[in-house]
């Protein structure tokens, strides 16, 4: 992208931000045998934006569809390896080997082998893990069900002894089921079967109820809770389960129970009622668990060794595959020659890059042992080229602020040149406090001094934005310190830094009164606001007047800059119509009204006059013939005002009427063959067309042009008033920032200091710090930033900036390694 070609080093000439780079449409004809290497070298150069010459074809119909599918399959394997390494906690190692030293065919074979091996290891490991989880559940069943059968056996033995002792022939309700055969007639004996297993605890009550209903109560079920969670063999997830034992009678009941167990996801395990066999099974299960644990551990070690091997080459393979895929995607944008022996490509490149592109084509032909070299030629076109600004790490953020509004049209004047200074300055006008500015500066210096380390780390969304705009914030903090010194505010506290105050108090009550009680005893305070103003009753009216007038002066100056930029645009594109019927009347209208107001403000400051400027400006329109009286600031002011008013009124039809008729006349002359000679000069014809707003089309809609000019005129006339008023936000936010800072200092810090209590002091200091950081350094910074952004986008840029271009996006490998699929 544009950001990667900054400064004046390397292949690029010195940076120029005012106009985008001159671009040219180039055509390259490349032999098939050197096409791959040619595109690779151009990707390393990163100065060609290829056009898709096969847009009518689907991706599957293109020449290199098979190669892209092959790269996609290798990329899938790479993603699989990355996922496996992430699960195992293995970090890919940074490699210093050159990716060009490896062959794609070798990589493909190696990836195939490694994937097959890893898949086999995972499958074996999953099978062993499933067996291990089943044995863990089986062991729990043996323990819990064994306890139940043992207690039942003990209870049966005790009851049998009691029956024999007391000679009681009746069956008890609690007679043990297992010993029933000893206490009943063998001819009347009923054989009971049983099933054991585990059921999820949240389903256990429903499971028991369904079993009871399905068998009409002809079952006996006993459940035991397992304290710790167990891993389910089927899902591989931890779950809380109960061990159950169900006794039933008959095969029909058994089939019902089996179906219900299957529906509830209950895992069943075999169990013997013989205590000796239970002990033998427990021993066997414990032994197998120990063996499986050892086997699983060995399998995981083997898997980790394999993943470590993959991690050593992972970054190298990943970068190689991404580059190859990007190369084939670009080759698919080139059209196949009718002979099918060469590829033809077209694309945009900066004019200065022609030599570097030709060198890359020559190197590719030599390195690929091609018998035929590539052909490079410049094409003539009327198509709008992309916009390319070479920026560095300092100017990139300012360019992004402008691009967020709209990318500059080809070779249109770039607002970023002045935004580098005006944006932080307007921010500082609203944020003027040199204490807060120092805090911002320290935070930004941390980001700047550690930028190499931080640029390689993944930061959060907010931190990423702050880091990306670190040089913008740096400039904002410097200007805030400057305006803070002018306002003489350090966390709202004034300091006589440059000299003592020019005033002294007439008496003791002077500080409680207005400035009438002050006597000027020394020279005027040399820089900024005299500290004596702070704390007096007239502080707010004085600062209000100062900042409001200052906001108007700044606003009118910046709007004039915008209109002057439109003059340089018109001059660059050789559009005399825009100079005489847009720039000139706009300058006259704005300065005859608000430029005149700015001059009155300066005269009032210099003379100390008590004239009411509101009255002067209002009655300049309402009663222009009335005498000014005490509001007169200079001789012949009435005549000057009448002249300015007349010029302002004349400038409105001057903007509206001539331009559509002149454009119509130019169109008619062009179609009579009077202007065809200019088409030989590609650059000029391109420039005229880009500035003409589409007036050179076959059909000239006069009504459409006239309505467009009418809207533009109305917008400028009304905008001159609303935009000037909009700059008063500088005054409002500056006042709000100052008052908030004063409130936090007086009502939090000083109030806490008034108590003779250390705890209250600490609380007061903490509240002051958090309020200052949270409200003034975060919220107020964001607020002032957004308002400065609005003033640039709306009030400044709409005077000259069209912003309807598109960004130069060259084919480059610079960002390939960081892209996500």
Curated annotation (Swiss-Prot):
One of its GO terms (cellular component) is vacuolar proton-transporting V-type ATPase, V0 domain. Keywords: Acetylation, Coiled coil, Hydrogen ion transport, Ion transport, Membrane, Transmembrane, Transmembrane helix, Transport, Vacuole. It comes from the Eukaryota. Its main location: membrane. Signal peptide: none annotated. Residues 444-470, 571-582, 663-757 are vacuolar. GO terms for molecular function: diphosphate hydrolysis-driven proton transmembrane transporter activity; proton-transporting ATPase activity, rotational mechanism. Residues 98-145 form a coiled coil. Residues 2-422, 492-549, 604-641, 779-821 are cytoplasmic. Expressed in etiolated seedlings hypocotyls. The keyword Cell inner membrane does not apply. The keyword Cytoplasm does not apply. It is found in: Vacuole membrane. It is a multi-pass membrane protein. Pfam families: V_ATPase_I. GO terms for biological process: proton motive force-driven ATP synthesis; vacuolar proton-transporting V-type ATPase complex assembly; vacuolar sequestering. The chain crosses the membrane at residues 423-443, 471-491, 550-570, 583-603, 642-662, 758-778. The modification N-acetylalanine is found at residue 2. Belongs to the V-ATPase 116 kDa subunit family. PANTHER family: V-TYPE PROTON ATPASE SUBUNIT A2, VACUOLAR PROTON ATPASES. V-ATPase is a heteromultimeric enzyme composed of a peripheral catalytic V1 complex (components A to H) attached to an integral membrane V0 proton pore complex (components: a, c, c'', d and e). Essential component of the vacuolar proton pump (V-ATPase), a multimeric enzyme that catalyzes the translocation of protons across the membranes. Required for assembly and activity of the V-ATPase. Involved in vacuolar nutrient storage (e.g. accumulation and storage of nitrate) and in tolerance to some toxic ions (e.g. zinc ions sequestration in vacuoles). This is V-type proton ATPase subunit a2. The gene is VHA-a2.
């Amino acid at each position: 992208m544009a950001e990667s070609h900054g400064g004046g080093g390397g292949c690029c000439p010195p940076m120029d931000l005012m106009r985008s780079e001159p671009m040219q449409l180039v055509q390259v004809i490349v032999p098939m045998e050197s096409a791959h290497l040619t595109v690779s070298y151009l990707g390393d150069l990163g100065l060609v934006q290829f056009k898709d010459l096969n847009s009518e074809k689907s991706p599957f119909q293109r020449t290199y569809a098979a190669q892209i599918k092959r790269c996609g399959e290798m990329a899938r394997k790479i993603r699989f390896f990355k996922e496996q390494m992430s699960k195992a906690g293995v970090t890919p190692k940074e490699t210093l080997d050159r990716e060009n030293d490896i062959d794609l065919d070798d990589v493909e074979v190696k990836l195939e082998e490694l994937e097959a091996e890893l898949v086999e290891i995972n499958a074996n490991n999953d099978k062993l893990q499933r067996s291990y989880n089943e044995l863990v559940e089986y062991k729990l069943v043996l323990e819990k069900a064994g306890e139940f059968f043992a207690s039942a056996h003990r209870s049966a033995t005790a009851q049998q002894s009691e029956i024999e002792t007391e000679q009681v022939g009746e069956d008890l309700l609690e007679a043990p089921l297992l010993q029933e055969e000893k206490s009943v007639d063998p001819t009347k004996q009923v054989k009971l079967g049983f099933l054991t297993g585990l059921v999820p605890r949240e389903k256990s009550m429903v499971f028991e109820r369904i079993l009871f209903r399905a068998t009409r109560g002809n079952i006996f079920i006993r459940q035991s809770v397992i304290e710790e969670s167990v891993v389910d063999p089927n899902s591989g997830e931890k779950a809380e389960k109960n061990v159950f034992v169900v006794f039933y009678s008959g095969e029909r009941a058994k089939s019902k129970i089996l179906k219900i167990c299957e529906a509830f996801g209950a895992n069943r395990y075999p169990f013997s009622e013989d205590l000796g066999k239970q002990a033998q099974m427990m021993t066997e299960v414990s032994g197998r668990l120990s063996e499986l644990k050892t086997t699983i551990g060995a399998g995981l070690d083997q898997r980790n060794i394999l993943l470590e091997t993959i991690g050593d080459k992972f970054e190298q393979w990943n970068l190689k595959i991404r580059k190859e895929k990007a190369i084939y995607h670009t080759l698919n944008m080139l059209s196949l020659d009718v002979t099918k022996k060469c590829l033809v490509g077209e694309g945009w490149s900066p004019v200065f890059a022609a030599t570097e592109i030709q060198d890359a084509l020559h190197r590719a032909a030599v390195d690929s042992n091609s018998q035929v070299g590539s052909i490079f030629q410049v094409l003539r076109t009327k198509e709008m080229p992309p916009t390319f600004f070479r920026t560095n790490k300092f100017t990139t953020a300012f360019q992004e602020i402008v691009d967020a509004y709209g990318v500059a049209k080809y070779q249109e004047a770039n607002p970023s040149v002045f935004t580098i200074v005006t944006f932080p300055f307007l921010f500082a006008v609203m944020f003027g406090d040199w204490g807060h500015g120092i805090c911002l500066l320290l935070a930004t210096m941390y980001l700047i001094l550690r930028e190499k380390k931080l640029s390689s780390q993944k930061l959060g969304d907010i931190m990423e934005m702050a880091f990306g705009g670190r040089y913008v914030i740096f400039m904002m903090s410097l200007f805030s310190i400057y305006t803070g010194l002018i306002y003489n505010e350090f966390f709202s506290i004034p300091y006589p830094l440059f000299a003592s105050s020019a005033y002294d108090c007439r008496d003791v009550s002077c500080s409680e009164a207005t400035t009438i009680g002050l006597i000027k005893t020394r020279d005027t305070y040399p820089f900024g606001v005299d500290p004596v103003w702070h704390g007096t009753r007239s502080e707010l009216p004085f600062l209000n007047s100062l900042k409001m007038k200052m906001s108007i002066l700044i606003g009118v100056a910046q709007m004039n800059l915008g209109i002057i930029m439109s003059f340089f645009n018109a001059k660059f594109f050789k559009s005399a119509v825009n100079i005489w019927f847009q720039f000139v009347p706009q300058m006259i209208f704005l300065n005859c009204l608000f430029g005149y107001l700015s001059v009155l403000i300066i005269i009032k400051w210099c003379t100390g006059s008590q004239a009411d400027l509101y009255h002067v400006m209002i009655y300049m329109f309402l009663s222009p013939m009335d005498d000014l009286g005490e509001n007169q600031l200079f001789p012949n002011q009435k005549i000057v005002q009448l002249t300015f008013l007349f010029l302002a009124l004349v400038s409105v039809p001057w903007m509206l009427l001539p331009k559509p008729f002149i454009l119509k006349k130019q169109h008619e002359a062009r179609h009579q063959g009077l202007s065809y000679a200019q088409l030989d000069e590609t650059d000029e014809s391109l420039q005229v067309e880009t500035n003409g707003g589409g007036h050179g089309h076959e059909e000239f809609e006069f009504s459409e042009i006239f309505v467009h000019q009418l809207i533009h005129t109305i917008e400028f006339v009304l905008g001159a008033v609303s935009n000037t008023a909009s700059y008063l936000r500088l005054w409002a936010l500056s006042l709000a920032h100052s008052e908030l800072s004063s409130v936090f200092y007086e009502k939090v810090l000083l109030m806490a200091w008034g108590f003779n209590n250390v705890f209250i002091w600490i609380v007061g200091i903490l509240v002051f710090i958090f309020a200052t950081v949270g409200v003034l350094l975060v919220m107020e910074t964001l607020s002032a930033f957004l308002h400065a952004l609005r003033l640039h986008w709306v009030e400044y840029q709409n005077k000259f900036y069209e912003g309807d271009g598109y960004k130069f996006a060259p084919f480059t490998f610079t960002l390939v390694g960081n892209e996500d699929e």
